[in-house]
């Protein structure tokens, strides 16, 4: 079970309570602050804590798990999340975010979309800095989606391209936003915005950005990628966001540690649920895993062990139910319930 770091050894600064966005990369059980100019860049081999403090003490704490992050890093991220949540008086709603399956709320913090880069902590130490010669940079990113646009690093080759998406070819001093003939307008706008963001945040504004239409590739692109072959066709269906609001695909469980171990008791196997089932003395699992999400509701009078074990309970539940590892998790303190959570219950105003 994840346990908090002693208060006397808090690795978080007092500024953690200030409004706005705070991001840390987890490194050897320590939170390493991410510079604001690098917000939205995530290394696939790492885990991150993302805290957003909004108005009226409305906070959301996200654990972002990279596809290639180690179990140790993920465990360290969970331990730090428990500590940070306690430090903030257990006010934040907690979310577990998996690379490529982030929540809409998480995506809203990054108007230019996300950029995934290969590697982990070691790669982060050697990434481009203001003193690095930009001419040495050669990276390719695929920009894909309709509602939530993400940029993912790809192999530097025409084989990575298709006609249905947009791609960013970052050559340091020149940044090309290439738009496939069948790409959608949202992808094109995001590709342009992300290319400009790379220029401004990573090149201090000293790079040339060019929007490239499929079939009108400049010589610099051909020089790096070679002669352009016939490209794969894009699949517009892949860009559709699945509807995750089917309230019937749900079940409600009560969490108890009365025996010294965390046990689950099913209270109802279909929604809408009776609101009276949620009592302040306990924690509950709302299983909407078939639609990609698990909720943990923490009663304000539940014991500390149950409250702090919420994330572990969710992860064990996902494993037990054989749901996808990237299933989203949302942990809600009593009084911080979202509208989506409330829709599973009868007459919750």
Swiss-Prot record:
Keywords: Acetylation, Actin capping, Actin-binding, Cell projection, Cytoplasm, Nucleus, Phosphoprotein, Repeat. One of its GO terms (biological process) is actin polymerization or depolymerization. The modification Phosphoserine is found at residue 338. It is found in: Nucleus; Cytoplasm; Melanosome; Cell projection, Lamellipodium. CDD domains: gelsolin_S1_like, gelsolin_S2_like, gelsolin_S3_like. InterPro entries: ADF-H/Gelsolin-like_dom_sf, Gelsolin-like_dom, Villin/Gelsolin. A motif (Nuclear localization signal) lies at residues 138-147. Its main location: nucleus. GO terms for cellular component: actin cytoskeleton; cytoplasm; lamellipodium; melanosome; nucleus; ruffle. Pfam families: Gelsolin (PF00626). This is Macrophage-capping protein.
């Amino acid at each position: 079970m994840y346990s908090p770091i002693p208060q006397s050894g808090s690795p978080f600064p007092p500024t953690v309570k200030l409004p706005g966005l705070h991001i840390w990369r987890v490194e050897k059980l320590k939170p390493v602050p991410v510079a604001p100019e690098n917000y939205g860049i995530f290394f696939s081999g790492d885990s991150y804590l993302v805290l957003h403090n909004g108005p009226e003490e409305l906070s959301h704490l996200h654990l972002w798990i990279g596809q290639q992050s180690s179990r140790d890093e993920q465990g360290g991220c969970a331990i730090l999340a428990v500590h940070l949540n306690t430090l903030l008086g257990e006010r934040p709603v907690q979310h577990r975010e998996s690379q490529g399956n982030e929540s809409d709320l998480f995506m809203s913090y990054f108007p230019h979309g996300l950029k995934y880069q290969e590697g982990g902590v070691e790669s982060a130490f050697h990434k481009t800095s203001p003193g690095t010669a930009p001419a040495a940079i050669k990276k390719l990113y695929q920009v894909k989606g309709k509602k939530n646009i993400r940029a993912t690093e790809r192999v530097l080759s025409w084989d990575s391209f298709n006609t249905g998406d947009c791609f960013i070819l970052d050559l340091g001093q020149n940044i090309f936003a290439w738009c496939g003939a069948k790409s959608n307008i949202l992808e094109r706008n995001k590709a342009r915005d992300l290319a400009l963001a790379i220029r401004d945040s990573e090149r201090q504004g000293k790079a040339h950005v060019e929007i490239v239409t499929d079939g009108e590739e400049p010589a610099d692109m051909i020089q790096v990628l070679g002669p352009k072959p016939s490209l794969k066709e894009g699949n517009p269906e892949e860009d559709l966001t699945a509807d995750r609001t089917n309230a019937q695909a749900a079940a409600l469980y009560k969490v108890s540690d009365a025996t010294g171990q965390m046990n689950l008791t099913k209270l109802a196997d279909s929604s809408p649920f009776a609101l009276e089932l949620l009592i302040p003395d306990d924690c509950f699992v709302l299983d909407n895993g078939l639609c990609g999400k698990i909720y943990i509701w923490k009663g304000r009078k539940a014991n500390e062990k149950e409250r702090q074990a919420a994330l572990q309970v969710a992860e064990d539940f996902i494993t037990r139910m054989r749901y996808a590892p990237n299933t989203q998790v949302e942990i809600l303190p009593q009084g911080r319930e979202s509208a989506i959570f409330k829709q599973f219950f009868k007459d919750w105003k």
